[in-house]
A protein has these predicted regions:
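Conserved ABC ATPase signature
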Residues: 231-235, 239
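Conserved beta-strand-loop-alpha-helix hinge in the C-terminal portion
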Residues: 69-91
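Catalytic Walker B motif of ABC-type/P-loop ATPase nucleotide-binding domains
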Residues: 14-17, 256-259
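H-loop/switch region of ABC-family ATPase nucleotide-binding domains
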Residues: 49-50
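The feature captures the beta-strand-to-loop junction immediately N-terminal to the Walker
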Residues: 142-144
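Helix-to-loop junction immediately C-terminal to a conserved catalytic motif
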Residues: 157
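Conserved ABC ATPase "signature" region
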Residues: 212-227
Length: 289
């Protein structure tokens, strides 16, 4: 819609800041086609992106920015010659999508959804029955834009008042209030969950028996230790995302939910987050992404 509005306004230059960050694969394909059409119409397009695969057939020049400075300029042919290792060394994501082989969900586990339902409209309904999840495991929730992934997380946490659930943990039925008390969430828009005036104070917020040393280690692992006295809202988008993840990891909640946690991140920080989440799952947690 924003791209269409810019085109209708008759502008000759369109600047986009991570336009694919919240899009699924199908929508990204549509975005790529739109950019190609705009380019053919003589419109100059500047795209700031971490996700680069969909731009490979469109881009003419690539500018690599590092710490606020122009590090290198590539022609399209020069950039296409970079292999995966060279891209990753520059903290860039791959030029091609990888296909993942993920095992099917096995039966059994301490966290049981006997029944869950949520009505979007008279015709559309989110419904789950008889699914179990184990402690110490990470579960991926996938689907196209607008299919109910975020709504499902909100239902599991206990944030959706209109939802109906029968959810058990270790044999005991959990009310919405109990699930909310025992859950931690990283939202899609982390600006909605940053409240204090200093990074370290944000980590302390709502945490009983706060472990200061553990918090400092987590910040260091995520490359955020130098911002410990900064205001959270002064961080960049990717830094805020990592910081929200650090905040969740300082809590003791057994149920942890990540809603699009890699949004706005480059390759190296995605690897850091992946390693930290894998380490975190061993601490008697059930993690939903």
């Amino acid at each position: 819609l924003c791209i269409a509005a810019s085109y209708i306004a008759g502008t000759k230059i369109i600047v986009m800041d991570e336009p694919s960050s919240n899009l699924d694969i199908k929508s990204i394909s549509v975005l790529a086609k739109m950019l190609k059409i705009l380019k053919e119409k003589g419109i100059s397009i500047i795209v700031a992106e971490h996700r680069i695969y969909y731009l490979m057939d469109i881009v003419d020049r690539v500018f690599l920015i590092d710490k606020g400075k122009l590090k290198k300029t590539y022609t399209r042919s020069e950039f296409l010659k970079l292999d995966k290792n060279e891209l990753n060394a520059l903290s860039l994501r791959d030029k091609e999508l990888s296909k993942l082989k993920v095992p099917y969900l096995k039966e059994g586990g301490e966290y049981q959804i006997k029944n869950l339902s949520y009505k979007f409209t008279d015709d559309e309904c989110l419904s789950l029955k008889d699914i179990s999840f184990k402690l110490g495991k990470i579960y991926g929730i996938i689907g196209s834009n607008g299919r109910g992934k975020s709504t499902l997380l909100r239902c599991l946490i206990g944030l959706e008042k209109k939802s109906k659930e029968e959810i058990y943990f270790k044999g005991e039925k959990l009310s919405k209030k109990e699930r909310l008390k025992n859950s931690s969430l990283v939202m899609q828009d982390v600006n909605h969950q940053l409240f204090t005036d200093e990074v370290f104070n944000e980590l302390r917020l709502g945490v009983k028996n706060f472990d200061e040393e553990k918090a400092k280690i987590i910040l260091k692992d995520l490359g955020l230790d130098e911002f410990i006295e900064r205001h959270p809202m002064s961080l960049s988008g990717g830094q805020k995302q990592r910081f929200a993840i650090a905040s969740v990891m300082c809590k003791t909640s057994p149920f942890v939910f990540f809603d699009e946690p890699s949004s706005g991140m480059d390759y190296s920080n995605m690897i850091k987050i992946s390693e930290l989440i894998n380490k975190y799952k061993t601490m008697d947690k059930i993690i939903f992404i």
